[in-house]
Amino acid sequence: MRLLILILLSVLVLFQHDFWFGSNGFLDYRQNAEKIKENQAENEKLSQRNQRINAEIQGLTKGFEAIEERARMQHGLVKENEVFYHIVKESK
């Protein structure tokens, strides 16, 4: 009877060891869950960035005003017979 109890306890210990420390065990599960959370956060950032870029693309393809604004701001372009004033804030 003692031998049977000893064998059952050793089998239980082996199963517990595999559960906690084995491949695909509890510790691996926790690490993978953390990686999933990090990846989901990164995906959310990228999704928001994609939405901003998509909105910018839609603005550029649909409206002339967006193209004109971009040309003025990024390239300093002005219309014919137009005076452009660039006001620079004084640094302290």
Curated annotation (Swiss-Prot):
Chief site of localization: membrane
Coiled-coil parts of chain: 28-63
Short name of one Pfam family: DivIC
Residue ranges that the UniProt entry lists as topological domain Periplasmic: 22-92
GO biological process: FtsZ-dependent cytokinesis
Subcellular locations according to the entry: Cell inner membrane
Record's keyword terms, sorted: Cell cycle, Cell division, Cell inner membrane, Cell membrane, Coiled coil, Membrane, Transmembrane, Transmembrane helix
Regions crossing the membrane: 4-21
Entry's Gene Ontology cellular component terms: cell division site; cell septum; plasma membrane
InterPro entries: Cell_div_FtsB, FtsL/DivIC
Membrane topology reported for the UniProt record: Single-pass type II membrane protein
Residues exposed to the Cytoplasmic side: 1-3
Alphabetical list of NCBIfam families matching this protein: PRK00888.1 (NF002058)
Function of the protein: Essential cell division protein. May link together the upstream cell division proteins, which are predominantly cytoplasmic, with the downstream cell division proteins, which are predominantly periplasmic.
Subunit structure: Part of a complex composed of FtsB, FtsL and FtsQ.
Protein family according to the UniProt entry: Belongs to the FtsB family.
Protein name: Cell division protein FtsB
Protein species of origin: Haemophilus influenzae (strain PittEE)
